[in-house]
Amino acid sequence: WWNLDDARYEIPKNGNKHSMFAGALWIGGVDAGGQLKVAAMTYRQGGSDFWTGPLNTTTATITPDECNEWDKHFKITRSEVEDHVANYLDPTYVMPDIIENWPAHGDPSQGQDFNLAPFYDAGQDGGEYNPYDGDYPDYNISGSNDNAKLFGDQTLWWIFNDQGNIHSETEAEPLGLEIHAQAFGFTADNEVNDMTFYNYKIINRSTLPLN
């Protein structure tokens, strides 16, 4: 929503109106020993509690190199996926890079979860993402996929965690969270056209339950 100096949450585009300066998740939990653990952010001027990338599912850790590798947003549109579903068998079809390289799976050498970015397994490849066999990022293209996990007409998807380094913002103990996030918007002829929405899947990768 901002670039560390100026507001960037501008809606509508080129309207020079910024309804938000900064925003972040604030998450806290208490373990069985009564220890409070927190991950939260304000303006990133005093530190950070969050870093990019998926955690090792066994150790709830991540290397700095992996954080850097995942320091990105994956931008996709529903129309790109609709076109892919309609034309992937056409020999003249050129598959968009975002569909071909959709981050569906984690890196097993880093202990990451096999399933990351959601996709529809149209080819029934045993859960392996293969867009050349008709698989696609998981919008409800058919109209009957009520379990679809991607929303909107344009979507930004990314992963972040609270284990990439010490919590220099709150100075609290980490929770061991891996968070799958998406920001999305719709093309509409009403107020929804000028809105954005957010969805977070919050996973506790630590070995301890938190309340």
Feature roles, as predicted:
Residues 1-211:
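A long-range scaffold signal marking pre-active-site subdomains of enzyme folds
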